[in-house]
Regions:
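Hydrophobic/small/kink-forming positions within alpha-helical transmembrane segments
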Residues: 21, 25, 69, 95-96, ...
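Glycine-/small-residue-enriched transmembrane alpha-helix faces in small-molecule transporters
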Residues: 2-38
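C-terminal transmembrane-helix exit sites in multi-pass transporters
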Residues: 96-114
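Hydrophobic residues within alpha-helical transmembrane segments
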Residues: 19, 62, 66, 92-93, ...
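Hydrophobic/aromatic residues within transmembrane alpha-helices
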Residues: 34, 78, 104-106
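Loop-to-transmembrane-helix transition segments
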Residues: 13-19, 50-70
Length: 131
């Protein structure tokens, strides 16, 4: 019975890691989207301050702050069940998702070197999770 409880906790902790990854990716994509929508960074000091304040208090950007906070809460929950050296490599999967989704949503180039890098990241996560 204890084994089943511990196994259930590990499964939940993996879900916490997944939630951390997805919430982090959401925050990054929304932040990029809204910064791009705000336009180019102004030259003048006062214009820069106003630009940053406008982006800072944008509702979508605020949602990215909230999801980043939620991601950190899920991360804390995951770390109650796993060693940091086991859990942390999974966070690198955010690079994979951000690369793919930035290609889809922002039409950023997905080049061969980027694909190779992503494959190496995934291989590293697989190897790291086995050890």
């Amino acid at each position: 019975m204890t084994y089943m409880i511990n196994e259930r906790k590990r499964e939940m902790a993996h879900l916490y890691i997944g939630a951390t990854i997805l919430l982090t990716v959401y925050a990054q994509l929304v932040f990029k989207w809204q910064v791009a929508m705000a336009g180019t960074f102004p030259v003048g000091s006062m214009e820069r301050i106003l630009f940053l304040l406008r982006v800072l208090f944008n509702p979508w950007v605020i949602s990215s702050y909230v999801t980043a906070l939620l991601a950190s809460l899920f991360w804390m929950a995951a770390l109650t069940q796993f060693e940091l050296s086991y859990a942390y490599p999974f966070i690198s999967l955010t690079f994979v998702l951000v690369l793919l989704l930035s290609g889809v949503f922002f039409h950023e180039p997905i080049t061969r070197p980027k694909i190779l890098g992503v494959l190496l990241i995934v291989a590293g996560v697989i190897v790291g999770s086995r050890g």
